[in-house]
UniProtKB/Swiss-Prot annotation:
GO molecular function, one term: toxin activity
Keyword Chaperone: no
Post-translational modification Pyrrolidone carboxylic acid, affected residues: Q1
Disulfide bonds: C3-C15, C4-C21, C10-C22
Family: Belongs to the conotoxin M superfamily.
Description of its domains: The cysteine framework is III (CC-C-C-CC).
Note: Found in injectable (milked) (IV) venom.
UniProtKB keywords: Disulfide bond, Ion channel impairing toxin, Neurotoxin, Pyrrolidone carboxylic acid, Secreted, Toxin, Voltage-gated sodium channel impairing toxin
Species of origin: Conus consors
Protein name listed in UniProt: Mu-conotoxin CnIIIB
Subcellular location: Secreted
Tissues where the protein occurs: Expressed by the venom duct.
GO CC annotations on file: extracellular region
Biological function: Mu-conotoxins block voltage-gated sodium channels (Nav). This synthetic toxin blocks slightly but irreversibly tetrodotoxin-resistant VGSCs.
């Protein structure tokens, strides 16, 4: 669980599921 905190992780498997979270950055 580092998607929200690290933009570099936004395209990893679990972050693709949480794309909303990454877009908020």
């Amino acid at each position: 669980q580092g998607c929200c905190g690290e933009p570099n992780l936004c395209f990893t498997r679990w972050c693709r599921n949480n794309a909303r979270c990454c877009r908020q950055q």
